[in-house]
Amino acid sequence: MPKSENQKLKLLYIVKILEEKTDSEHGITLSQLLKELEAYGISAERKSLYSDIESLKQFGYDIVGEKGYRNYYYKLVSRDFELAEL
């Protein structure tokens, strides 16, 4: 049973956050991702985020993790085209 009703939307919010907060040069840490999810009323644990990100990758999202100076950063590298790009 989900911890909250919004829990079912967690994967969608993760994609939304990655689309809005990252690009090919700038990533987001798991701590930052947790804070962003909390803003949407979704509680999550670091361990579950690893699994969620892996599920999104298996589904076809081009999510890359990179080790930075002190942290590990996740970013959504390739995206759908924006209307302006067409």
What are the language-model segments listed below?
Residues 1-86:
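Short, basic/aromatic recognition patches that contact phosphate-bearing ligands
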